[in-house]
C-alpha cells in the first residue's frame, strides 16, 4: 500500500494535489444561490355576498358580479408563488372587516389586513389605540372617492391623521387627483407612515388621459420620508395587453422618485380580473421591467411592504 508521501510522488498523485487548491478556489468564487424571493401582494379585495344578515350600504357596486373569497384566492397564490396577501376590505361592504379577519383566522401566515373605520365619525378615534392588537391587523386603509373627497377639505378627516400617528398605525390612502393635500399631512405628521394607493391613479383618470399628471402628483410626495407608494393595479390603468408597456414610464418615474424600498407591488386583481392571470401580474414586474435589478425586485415584490407594515 502506498503511503501518502509515496502517492504524492507519483504523477497521478501530484495531479490530484495540484487540482485540489484549484477546485477550492473555484468553489470559493462560485456565488451562493440567491435566497427565494418573497412575493407579497400589497392589495387584494375579498368580500361576501350582499345578504339580509350582512347587508352592504345602499348604491354600492362590487368590482365583480360574484363574491371573491379567500378560498378562491389561495389556489391562485399557490400556483403563482405568492407567499402572502394584504387584504383590503372593499368599500362596497362599508366599514366592516369581519370577513378579512375570518380569512386571517383560518390562514394566519398568508393574510394580513389593512382595516377600515368610520372615518366621518370622530368617535372612531377610540378604536385606534388598540387597533393593531386585533389579530392580523396591520393598519388602516382610507378612501376619498366622490363625495368623500370633501372630507379632506372640510375638516371631517382632520382628527384621523394625528390619532393614527400617535397610535403608530400605517395608513394606505386612495385619493386620486387629490394627492397635493397629503403634502401638508405628511409634513405635519412625520411619524405617520402614509402609503399612496395605485400610483395615484384611478379608472376615470386613465380614461381621461391624465395618468401623467396623476403620477406626477404621487412622485412629488417622495420628498417626505414617511410617504411610500403602491405600484399596484397596473393592468387596470393600461390600454394595452400584457406586458402593459404604456405603464412602464409611470412605474419607472415612481421607482426613480421613491426608490425600491418605498415601492410595493400589488395586484388589486379584482379591479381588472380578466386582463391578467396572477402569474402574469407577478411576471410583469419580475421579467418585463428591465430597469429593475434583482435586488430591486426583492424589495418591491415583498420585502419592502413587509418592512413598512411591520409584518
Write out the residue ranges for each language-model feature.
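Mid-to-C-terminal alpha-helical segments outside catalytic/metal-binding sites
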Residues: 2-21, 30-42, 62-84, 252-253, ...
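Active-site glycine-centered loops adjacent to acidic/histidine catalytic or metal-binding residues
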Residues: 268
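Histidine-centered divalent metal-coordination motifs
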Residues: 43-47, 198
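Catalytic pocket-lining loop regions of alpha/beta-barrel enzymes
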Residues: 138, 151-264
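Acidic/histidine-rich helix-loop elements
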Residues: 47-67, 205-207
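Short, electropositive alpha-helical surface patch
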Residues: 95-110, 247-256, 281-288
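Active-site phosphate/pyrophosphate- and oxyanion-stabilizing loops and adjacent acidic/basic residues
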Residues: 74, 101-102, 129, 183, ...
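Active-site gating/metal-coordination segments in enzymes
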Residues: 83-84, 93-177, 184, 228-234, ...
